[in-house]
Structure formats: structure tokens, C-alpha cells
């Protein structure tokens, strides 16, 4: 099956969050199942030094009144074909942010749609997060291309409809207040990156004001757990580590701990309980919760804390102040460094993820793979990946807490600290986490089933009045539309675009060839 990924990130070249890991690692696993998977992404200026890109593009075209070029390259580790949308708007050294962010990603989405119609036509176009949210809208009237939309983080929803009307051409059948909502309505299948998150986003607490809409489209919504690349993340072969180790022999992990303590300016103590955290410093990740309990933890236990990440200035300042109060016990590195992140996974005894919400989370998978026991909140993908430690039954791989409260988090930390005193059982806990199978091969099978289910399928345009009623949280069941007194919208009977025609032609005022 021909599958085209459209995304704003791809590891290891361009990575800000978990989406980059998914886009970089899932395609090779799908290729093992016989699929021809390719990627289209923005041609960021950083990529020209990281990939071998020919001087001449393979295609030139125009969209949104702007010319662009598409270059072909290969993924540096797995050989996947990558198409880069080249335009000066992608030249600045940034991925997200900037005043032109909405225009920039809408332009990319439009270019990706044009490429799919005119150069390499996939059977399934797999879109990732709001940056590609307009693609399912434009593809909705093309019977030859089915669309899948993956929600990596529902909190970020893209430009609102009024702005889209100004910067691009919104089809007459488009519904939804913003890019994310439009994608949820028009995609033929929707998935979240963990089963628990797929259920949570249908509630008011985690639905980011889209829970009504997500309940409306629940028939095409599913949760598929993320995985990790077990070859790229293997402590037995990782060249970034000062010593390698495995579940069968943990000797090298003690060496990694000592090197981490030395590099971060901590007291070099084998008996210290070293806690690691590699994260974006944002509200979602629970860094504020750590700041509320860290003083007590560092004052009354022999714990040490290492934090790596960047983000909110207030959280950065709070962490700097914490480190200054506890020299030798707390260290903060406000940047992102892949080699250092691997050393933290390898050198830490436990790994912190006290998230407010967590669509899936990949850091806890890396941590377990490297023998760092996760301390997490029971939310989203953390529920699906970190079973709670049960010392009586010798089960579980981490320590969990339920409420987003300092006392709950602190209690979980103390439980982990006490468990660390019993080294033999602690090593058993580490080994259970290291031998769990969270490979992409398992996840790829579920994506394969979804692709086969959606290929050749086009979901009908939902009735506008019924959609509006359901999105406002009213008790409407889309399967019982005949029992609800609403007027059918004209879009419900709109004719499909004939095969071989580009639905954007009439939007751009062009004739079909």
C-alpha cells in the first residue's frame, strides 16, 4: 500500500516532541509489513546540513499564490524517501512559533496536498497534528485518497476558521472552528497515540473543548500506543554512554551514574537516589509540581535531581533557583542535548513524569529501556505503559499516583526512595522494565489494520446541524440522526469529485487537465 506521511517533525533530524519520534520510527516498521511509506515535510534550513539533498528539485509548483519546490532526500538511518517543501518561509532557525506560523503550516499543508495529487499519489495520506489539519479537508472530496489523522497533542489546535478564510481557500463543505476540529470532522480515520488518551479526550477534563466533537466522531476514533526504536535505544550498544550494560548485567549502569554525577556537578555517591527528568519545561509536564515537592525531598532524603530541557521562562527560573539552593544535589541543564539525555536515562535511578496530561509519552519508555524506574501520574499513555509496582506479586515497572497534587506526587517519590533501599528487589524492578516490549513492530500491526480498514473509504460529510448540536455537548447520538429533528444540510448530499480531478482546482480558479 502507498502511504504518505505529512508532518512537521521527523527524528533524528528535526525533533521537538514525541511526534518527531513517531514519524521517524513508525515508517520502517510499516515497511517490514510490505508498505511503501514516504514522508513529506517542510524543508527547514537545518536539513540541508543533515541530509544529502540534490541542488535541483523534482517538482516546482504554486499554491496559495506562492511558488514552491519539492526536493527528494533519504532518511539518514532507515533510508525512507523524504520530500521536502522548499520555500524561504522555512529558512529561519525555528520549527514552531513566529508571527507567520499559521500561514507557514497552512502553506505546507496546501503544498503537500498539491504534491499528492500531481506527483506521488498515495492510497492513504497520514496527517499528524494541526499543522497538517487542512489536508483531510481538501482530500475529503477525492475518492482516490483516504486520510488518517493522528492526534499527538489535542491542546495545540491551529488557526481559527476566520484566520484560515484570510490565508487560504476553505472549501464550501468545511466545518469546524479551527484546523484541528476540521481535521477531526473530515479525516476518514482518527487515532490518538494511546488507548487511554483516546478515551480521556472524550471527557470535559481532557477534551480541550473538543470532547463533544470527539464523541460525535468516536466511531472512527481509536487509540494506538506509540513505540520506540529498540535498536536506536539500546543500552547494550549505545555509543553515547561511557559504559554499556543490559538487563543480564547492570554493571555498566553504575559507571553511567558516576559519570552523570561528575558531569552535572553532583556529589559522586553510589548510594544517592538519583532522579532524572528530560522534558519540555511547559505546564503540561508537571514541572511546577516538582518545584513544590523538591525542597522537602532534597532536605530530608539522600536524593539528587537532574533536569534537562527548555521552555517556560518562569519554570526555568524556578529550576535555576532550586539548583542554587542545593548545590551538589540538584543540577539543571536548560537546553536539549541528545547525548546528555541518553546519559540521564542511563545514569538515573528513577525518572520523573508527573504530567497534567500525557497523550502517550515516550520518555518513560526510554527510561525503562535504560533501567531507570519511572515515577508517573496515572494519566493518558502513562496508564498504558507503566503498570504500578507491586512488591508482593513482583509485578509492575514503576510508581504511580492519581491526583495532580503535591502530596500525591511526594508520596510516590517516597515510596520509590524506600524501594531503592532494597537493591536486590530494585534491580528486579529495573530488569522488568528493560525487558518490556514497546517496539514499533507491535504498534505497526495496529496501524496496518487501520490502513486496510480505511483504504478506499471516504466518510460522508456529517450533517451540519447535527454536528453543531453534538459539538455543544447536547445529548445527541449520531447513530440515531433520523430521530433528531434537524434540517439536513446541503453538504450531506454534495456530489463526490470525479476520479482524477483535483478538488482544489475550483478553489484556485484553475481548470482540470
From Swiss-Prot:
Report the Pfam families cross-referenced here.
Glyco_transf_5 (PF08323), Glycos_transf_1 (PF00534)
Q: Which UniProt keywords apply?
A: Glycogen biosynthesis, Glycosyltransferase, Transferase
Annotated spans, Disordered: 471-513
Swiss-Prot/TrEMBL catalytic activity: [(1->4)-alpha-D-glucosyl](n) + ADP-alpha-D-glucose = [(1->4)-alpha-D-glucosyl](n+1) + ADP + H(+)
Stored Gene3D superfamilies? Glycogen Phosphorylase B
State which pathway it belongs to: Glycan biosynthesis; glycogen biosynthesis
Q: Where is the composition biased (Basic and acidic residues)?
A: 474-483
One of the entry's Gene Ontology molecular-function terms is:
alpha-1,4-glucan glucosyltransferase (UDP-glucose donor) activity
- Enumerate the Gene Ontology biological process terms: glycogen biosynthetic process
The UniProt record lists the keyword Transferase = yes
Q: Which family does it belong to?
A: Belongs to the glycosyltransferase 1 family. Bacterial/plant glycogen synthase subfamily.
The entry's protein name is Glycogen synthase
- Protein source organism: Synechococcus sp. (strain CC9902)
Q: Which gene encodes it?
A: glgA
Amino acid at each position: 500500500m502507498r502511504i504518505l506521511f505529512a508532518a512537521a517533525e521527523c527524528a533524528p533530524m528535526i525533533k521537538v516532541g514525541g511526534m518527531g519520534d513517531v514519524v521517524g520510527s513508525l515508517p520502517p516498521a510499516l515497511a517490514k509489513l510490505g508498505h511503501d511509506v514516504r514522508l513529506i515535510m517542510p524543508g527547514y534550513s537545518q536539513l540541508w546540513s543533515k541530509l544529502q539533498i540534490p541542488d535541483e528539485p523534482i517538482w516546482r509548483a504554486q499554491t496559495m499564490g506562492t511558488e514552491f519546490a519539492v526536493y527528494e532526500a533519504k532518511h539518514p538511518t532507515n533510508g525512507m524517501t523524504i520530500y521536502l517543501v522548499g520555500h524561504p518561509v522555512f529558512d529561519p532557525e525555528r520549527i514552531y512559533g513566529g508571527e507567520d506560523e499559521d500561514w507557514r503550516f497552512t502553506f505546507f499543508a496546501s503544498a503537500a496536498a498539491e504534491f499528492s495529487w500531481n506527483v506521488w499519489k498515495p492510497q492513504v495520506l497520514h496527517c499528524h497534528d494541526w499543522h497538517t489539519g487542512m489536508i483531510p479537508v481538501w482530500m475529503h472530496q477525492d475518492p482516490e485518497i483516504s486520510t488518517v489523522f493522528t492526534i499527538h497533542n489535542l491542546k495545540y489546535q491551529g488557526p481559527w476558521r476566520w484566520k484560515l478564510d484570510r490565508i487560504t481557500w476553505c472549501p464550501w463543505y468545511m466545518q469546524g472552528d479551527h484546523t484541528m476540529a476540521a481535521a477531526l470532522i473530515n479525516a476518514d480515520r482518527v487515532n490518538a497515540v494511546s488507548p487511554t488518551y483516546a478515551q480521556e479526550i472524550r471527557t470535559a477534563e481532557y477534551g480541550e473543548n473538543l470532547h463533544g466533537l470527539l464523541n460525535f466522531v468516536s466511531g472512527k476514533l481509536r487509540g494506538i500506543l506509540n513505540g520506540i526504536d529498540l535498536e536506536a535505544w539500546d543500552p547494550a550498544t549505545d555509543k553515547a554512554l561511557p559504559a554499556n550494560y543490559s538487563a543480564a548485567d547492570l554493571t555498566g549502569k553504575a559507571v553511567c551514574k558516576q559519570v552523570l554525577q561528575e558531569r552535572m556537578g553532583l556529589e559522586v555517591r553510589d548510594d544517592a537516589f538519583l532522579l532524572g527528568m528530560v522534558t519540555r519545561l511547559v505546564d503540561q509536564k508537571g514541572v511546577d509540581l516538582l518545584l513544590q515537592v523538591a525542597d522537602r525531598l532534597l532536605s530530608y532524603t539522600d536524593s539528587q535531581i537532574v533536569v534537562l530541557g527548555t521552555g517556560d521562562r518562569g519554570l526555568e527560573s524556578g529550576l535555576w533557583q532550586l539548583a542554587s539552593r542545593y548545590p551538589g544535589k540538584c543540577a539543571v541543564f536548560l537546553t536539549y542535548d541528545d547525548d546528555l539525555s541518553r546519559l540521564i536515562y542511563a545514569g538515573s535511578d528513577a525518572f520523573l513524569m508527573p504530567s497534567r496530561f500525557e497523550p502517550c509519552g515516550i520518555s518513560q519508555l526510554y527510561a525503562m529501556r535504560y533501567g531507570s524506574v519511572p515515577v508517573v501520574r496515572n494519566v493518558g499513555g502513562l496508564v498504558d505503559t507503566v503498570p504500578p509496582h507491586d512488591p508482593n506479586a513482583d509485578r509492575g515497572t514503576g510508581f504511580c499516583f492519581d491526583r495532580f497534587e503535591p502530596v500525591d506526587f511526594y508520596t510516590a517519590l517516597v515510596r520509590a526512595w524506600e524501594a531503592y533501599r532494597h537493591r536486590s528487589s530494585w534491580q528486579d524492578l529495573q530488569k522488568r522494565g528493560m525487558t518490556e516490549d514497546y517496539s514499533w513492530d507491535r504498534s505497526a500491526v495496529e496501524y496496518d489494520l487501520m490502513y486496510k480498514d480505511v483504504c478506499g473509504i471516504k466518510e460522508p460529510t456529517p450533517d451540519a446541524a447535527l454536528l453543531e448540536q453534538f459539538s455543544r455537548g447536547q445529548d445527541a447520538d449520531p447513530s440515531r440522526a433520523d430521530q433528531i429533528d434537524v434540517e439536513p444540510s446541503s453538504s450531506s448530499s454534495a456530489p463526490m469529485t470525479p476520479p482524477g480531478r483535483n478538488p482544489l482546482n475550483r478553489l484556485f480558479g484553475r481548470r482540470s487537465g
